[in-house]
Amino acid sequence: MIQFKRETCSDLEGALRREWLETNGLGGFASSTIIGLNTRRYHGLLVAATKPPLGRLVLLSKLEETLFIDGKGFDLSANRYPGVVHPLGFRYLKKFRLAPFPVFTYEAEGIEIEKSVFMIHGENSTAILYVLKKEDNRRESPKNVGLEIRPLIAFRDYHGTTHENDAINPEVQERSGLASVTPYEGLPSLHSAHNAIELRKTGNWYRNFEYDAERKRGLDFSEDLFSPFMLRFDLRFCRQASIIASTEPRGVAQAVEYRRAEITRRRKTLVACPTEDSFIQSLAAASAQYIVSRGDDKTVIAGYHWFGDWGRDTMIALPGLTLPTGKYEIARSILRTFAKHVNQGMLPNRFPDAGGTPEYNTVDAALWFFEAARSYLAYTGDLEFVRDELYPVFVDIISWQVCGTRYGIKVDDSGLLASGELGVQLTWMDAKVGDWVVTPRRGKPVEIQALWYSALCIMEDLAGRFADEVAQKRYHHMAAVAQRSFNRLFWNEDLGCLHDVVNGGPPDASIRSNQIFAVSLPHSMLPQDRARRVVEKVEEHLLTPFGLRSLAPSDAQYHGCYTGGPAERDGAYHQGTVWPWLLGPFISAYIKVNGGSEQAKRQAQAWLSPLESHLADAGLGHVSEIFEGDAPHRPCGCVAQAWSVAEILRAYFEDVRGLRPKPRASSPNQSKNCWPDFSRSLRPEPVHQRHTALRSKDRTRHSNNSCLDP
């Protein structure tokens, strides 16, 4: 359990860098700092997903809370205004803990109250419960203990801010135990169920809130919030005050039952976690917060607070988020979700927040799709699902890659996968500022080739399972050609590692973390001696306590700090910034080249230790998106990132613990940390030497196209 006592809560700077997160399984969330002072425009008690998992609106920003003891008021809130923090409610915060959701314990003049905040799973609803816990027996018992609460509403897109305006409708619709507001036409209503003894309409604007995290990011950081009413509770009479803020009308009587149900639901996650390691159990609990609904199926939120569901992130995160803990139905649903959206051999890069057509500017999401499906099949043996719903899509993807699809993505005469157009970012190193693509990587990026080869090996295996001998031979041949070309073109003997990009001219010899995938993936193109040298080079130049740097510090383009406005930060995003998710493939590769030895596993476990301490910093219970490249490696970006959590879980269970799914007898090509056999007689023939023109007007399905003829 993560817990902070008074000394931490009263340290303003330390308290503000620790943020809690509640989610609802729809893409909505509630979040703030441990003292309730909002530092981001994304903070709020109800950030509703109006078009799950997107369309997120900050409806209820926060509550202004005042505890009254015999008429004397104690403000429990905290806000930052220009030049001042007011009030200073954290002075009364005795303790904060995650148990399993945020619980705040306040104490004033011997009176102790406990506040719990949690979201109701599957609803855009947040419950806030206050309980009178203790009265100091050393003093005369107070005659009156009350609580006044003023909701502060924003009603805006979660990427923006709002300001005082005349368009707001201040009306409050009242009925017994329910207060409803609809401040703007076209936006949802906010319904506040409560057990207050009094509701008083106020209609006040609170001006000039400042969000310091946004100021540091060079973004709009000032906002005005509206308070439509005040609620007064008598804690001496019922000892409990309850509010349920929701987009749907509901009663408050079930608040305690909702709390009990949420605790039970979350405990089931830990029961399914096959370890007693508290660090891994915490990550397993966190993993559930990234899995959300998209229609009738499931998807993955890439990161909180501002990411939606991205194809690449989802496929990378899927194995770690779902498979070691037995969430096979969810994994299958996620695979089905994205199979529906494959278009011209590509998976969506992202779904826009406002809805509409997905964006397809990614070369690797479709390739990670193969790897996610391979993992799913290895854990479940669900061959029927793969055969009926995924295999036809995979055949189509390979065909499009060979014949050519958007953005210059096409297999060239080397049998490797080339990609790239001017002004378009296609790999995971996708930062773009205006027309400036920071790391364009046009040509043949190293990890794309590793994924391409792995996809071909997976297809060879599947074709064999499905008794498609012709296809099996075809994929075997394509993989062999790619393997030969890769070793010829990508090995940098001078540095003893792999080039990052090959593109006709001088190869890009930057020492980047991308090369680790040529070792970590189950199907590797490298002989063991080269694989070992790659791992050693990555360890020497890129390994930090929190993950791998994206670029070696010795490089002239290296950025060790991640600060400033959007242009400055995007310029550093993949130019030295540390990515925790890369620790997963690094651990896989390290244990692999060391033959799965116990010593290697102990070393890998040691590399995970700093991240355990990190769970009590930044996004509590989660792993941040990135860290600065220079020590002490300040956490940055999203405070909770799906693939950061997922890859640590996957590497821990599969590599450190060795709990890999056992290869099935019917899968002759299932890798067992083995290395490619270079003794096979392979002809380095161009894989698509016999291209023919596409005749079909509808290019969304051409799995039998002659581009794939061997």
Where are these regions (language model features)?
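Terminal accessory carbohydrate-recognition/targeting modules of carbohydrate-active enzymes
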Residues: 1-273, 305, 312, 327, ...
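Inter-helical turn/loop segments and adjacent helix faces that build the functional surface
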Residues: 137-139, 143, 376-389, 458-475, ...
